[in-house]
Design a protein with these regions (language model features):
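Acidic/histidine-rich catalytic cores of soluble enzymes
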Residues: 136-220
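Gly/Pro-rich active-site loop or hairpin
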Residues: 44, 75-76, 115-125, 185-249, ...
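Active-site acidic/histidine proton-transfer and metal-coordination neighborhood
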Residues: 79-174
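Conserved, mostly hydrophobic/aromatic
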Residues: 32, 98, 143, 178, ...
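N-terminal pre-domain/capping segments
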Residues: 1-88, 310-339, 344
Length: 365
């Protein structure tokens, strides 16, 4: 098996482009990941179009969606239009695969939404599989899902690997293993990163994401809450586990470093970002790659039904939960709410408050 390619999640901001220019000039960026739907409503700058086309023509472009919302309980015109635009995008450029986030964004202003987790349940699994069928049918490419950083409870953390494994089974899909997302869960629920990583089907990992984040003070306990804000350096704890993770992921093809485009402004920040890139490069070069059973991603026939799978009761709960969080309802009030799908009685009060802060920041209504 070849060593995985090292690349970046491309950002259009001038600060980001200035920071990565030395890497582009030295041909160090072996693959680009592009969140294609952030420009669905705008025209790409000419320089960006040319850069993406260059990587596309060399089979080194991968796509990462943000706004599909895999687990919305109702199928909407917005999702239908999203898939139509994605079809146009994959006709325009050659992508090696397309990925999306785990979770749902049940808001009126989806462009300012944030994905929230869903519990493992036969109905949520059925909805997720239906949305993945439609995604793969639209692009006729391998399709993958990224693990989510945010969790309301340790139960969410423990079941996500199993959920994702079941979710991708019918389409021969793959996983993005985001190690900073796992780092957030490890910090917030006081477990070891390795213990969470072991819960994932590592043979299904085709791509790894690396990034940094930030801390916020806990209101309910004497600890700090880790947030996946993509605005800082890769934590040392992630560097510590990365060699082992690379060795365990027998079908790994890509390692992508993520950083928000407006967060690398000073020369010191640029140098530190480049140092992170160089350090990851060294780890990949020094890693011991094991050859596993080669998987042909996305080769199964999809079980696409004529009508999208929907569930009115789940939709009501998603809408009610989002509004409770947006309205800053008390944690105890939310924990006492009667839900069928969401087990709010098990939720951590700090995580409820964190979700409220995120949703208020993005103002989905």
């Amino acid at each position: 098996m070849k060593k995985p390619l090292l690349g970046l999640s491309m950002m259009p901001e001038a600060d980001f482009v200035s920071a990565i220019l030395p890497l582009l000039q030295s041909n160090s960026v072996e693959v680009l990941e592009w969140s294609f739907d952030i420009f669905y409503e705008a025209k790409e700058p000419e320089w960006l179009d040319e850069l993406l086309n260059f990587y596309s023509e060399n089979q080194r472009l991968i796509g990462h969606g943000v706004y599909y919302s895999l687990f919305d309980a109702l199928w909407t015109e917005r999702q239908e239009n999203w898939l139509k635009k994605l079809k146009e995008e994959v006709r325009k450029r050659k992508y090696s695969h397309i990925t999306e986030h785990f979770g749902f964004m049940n808001t009126e202003n989806f462009h300012q939404g944030v994905p929230l987790p869903v519990p493992l349940h036969p109905k949520t699994l059925l909805i997720g599989k239906d949305r993945l069928y439609r995604l793969q049918d639209a692009v006729e490419l391998p399709v993958g899902i990224e693990n989510l950083a945010f969790s309301f409870s340790i139960e969410d953390v423990k079941e996500q690997g199993v959920f994702l494994d079941n979710l991708i089974a019918d389409i021969n899909g793959f996983l993005i293993l985001d190690l900073h997302n796992i780092y957030c869960q490890a910090c917030n629920f006081e477990v070891e990163m390795e213990d969470i990583i072991r819960l994932y089907p590592l043979d299904k990992v085709r791509e790894i994401h690396l990034s940094g984040g930030s801390w916020q003070e806990s209101v309910y306990a004497r600890k700090m809450i880790r947030r996946d804000t993509h605005d800082n350096l890769i934590p040392e704890e992630i560097f510590s586990v990365l060699p082992s993770v690379i060795t365990q992921c027998n079908n790994l093809e890509y390692v992508i470093i993520e950083r928000l485009g407006h967060t690398i402004k000073t020369d010191q920040e640029k140098r530190a970002f480049l140092d992170d890139f160089t350090r990851v490069r060294r780890i990949i070069d020094d890693s011991e790659i094991k050859t596993g059973k080669k998987i042909r991603w996305g080769q199964k026939e999809t079980g696409l039904s004529n009508s999208p799978v929907e569930d009115d009761a789940l939709h009501e709960e998603q809408s009610r939960l989002t509004k409770l969080l947006f309205n800053s309802s008390g944690a105890e009030m939310i924990k006492e709410q009667r839900f069928h799908y969401f087990k709010t009685e098990n939720w951590d009060p700090d995580m409820i408050l964190t979700a409220q802060n995120i949703i208020k920041k993005w103002n989905p209504y």
